[in-house]
């Protein structure tokens, strides 16, 4: 018994080459693009899969044909590389773009420091240094700008900048493993006060608060033991003028602070050691 049937010739679903005109989104002026031969593609022509290709392995410019790789996709998507296998990597800022920022107000955190220096350029890193024992700011930090030029601009803008009543010290941080060259010393009068017999729980911020009632405080520092991290019971305060220093000494020497009688007098400069 004969059976009825018809012969239909179906075109192959995929071909190894196709005219570039069928892909209007590709320009005939494109340069050849070569992916690494070790990287798999998304399509295997041998298996007649219905998955559409995502990556083009070779774009031929001579005959305007689009050639698909015949390897099967496996694993993660490949990463693109340029000519000669070059990859774009992040470059760390120069050490010359790192700044030391001293005499910071104690309520300024790293975020506030970064926001301040954004006026000079792009801030890569901003860090306020804290005491490990008390978790309080030590009054200084570091800022790394994006370029050396921006770092120079930041020094110009913020050196001796008045931030909440304190004059900032801003200069280039010394590169790791090297000692900064010391500038020639010039004599500048400092109105520094020694404060003794202070209570053990007094920190820099409280000491500054006490002396700020008698003038502008440039800096205030309680001396802590390096090993234990506890106060050694004395500190130093620098006022902005001789008159304010004299007023603070006259009003605070012999006064009681949290149950202890404090000693307040002009600090003596340490004698310089002779070098041979």
UniProtKB/Swiss-Prot annotation:
* Main location group: plastid
Q: Which residues form the RRM domain?
A: 97-175, 191-269
List GO terms (cellular component aspect): chloroplast thylakoid membrane; ribonucleoprotein complex
Designated name of the protein:
28 kDa ribonucleoprotein, chloroplastic
Q: Which SMART domains match?
A: RRM
Q: Which domain of life is it from?
A: Eukaryota
Keyword Chloroplast, does the record have it? yes
Which Gene Ontology terms cover its molecular function?
mRNA binding
